[in-house]
Design a protein with these regions (language model features):
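Conserved beta-strand-loop-alpha-helix hinge in the C-terminal portion
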Residues: 86-113
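Conserved ABC nucleotide-binding domain
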Residues: 1-8
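Helical segment within the ABC ATPase nucleotide-binding domain
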Residues: 45-59
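Conserved H-loop
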Residues: 60-66
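Conserved catalytic motifs of ABC-family nucleotide-binding domains
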Residues: 27
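ABC ATPase nucleotide-binding domain "signature motif"
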Residues: 11-17
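Catalytic Walker B motif of ABC-type/P-loop ATPase nucleotide-binding domains
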Residues: 31-34
Length: 123
C-alpha cells in the first residue's frame, strides 16, 4: 500500500511502523529502541508494542527498549533496569515473568507496575 510513497506522504504512525519493520527485517542480533513511540496516540502505541513483541518472538533479536513509561516497560520487558537519578546508575534489575500478551489490568501486572513506580520515586 505504501511501497511507492515518500516519507513526507506518510503519517507519523505509519512511518514509525515502517522504521520498526525495516529494523527487524535486517535481522540484527541486537536492536536498540530509544523511546520509539514518541507522541504517538495510545491506540497505535498498543498496536506497535504488540508488533514489537511478535517480531521479537519471530526473529529472536535481543531488544533493548529505553522508555520513561513504566506501563510500557512492564508490558514489553522480560527484564527492567531501574535507574537512579543523576548520575544514573542501576538501582535494581527486575525480572518480569508474565506471559505475553500481558493483561494490563491483571493483579500481577498492576503489582509490578506499582513496585517499579515506588522504586523510582525520588521526591
Amino acid at each position: 500500500k505504501f511501497a511507492e510513497s515518500y516519507p513526507s506522504q506518510l503519517s507519523v504512525s505509519t512511518e514509525q511502523r515502517m522504521v520498526i519493520g525495516r529494523a527487524f527485517a535486517m535481522n540484527p542480533d541486537l536492536l536498540l529502541m530509544d523511546e520509539p513511540y514518541g507522541q504517538m496516540d495510545i491506540k497505535m502505541r498498543f498496536y506497535l508494542e504488540d508488533e514489537v513483541i511478535r517480531l521479537w518472538k519471530e526473529t529472536g533479536t535481543t531488544v533493548i527498549f529505553i522508555t520513561h513509561n513504566i506501563e510500557e516497560a512492564v508490558y514489553l520487558a522480560q527484564k527492567v533496569l531501574i535507574l537512579t537519578n543523576k548520575p544514573a546508575k542501576v538501582k535494581e534489575r527486575l525480572s518480569i515473568d508474565l506471559p505475553h500478551p500481558r493483561n494490563v489490568s491483571g493483579s500481577e501486572f498492576i503489582r509490578i507496575r506499582k513496585y517499579v513506580t515506588d522504586q523510582i520515586k525520588w521526591w
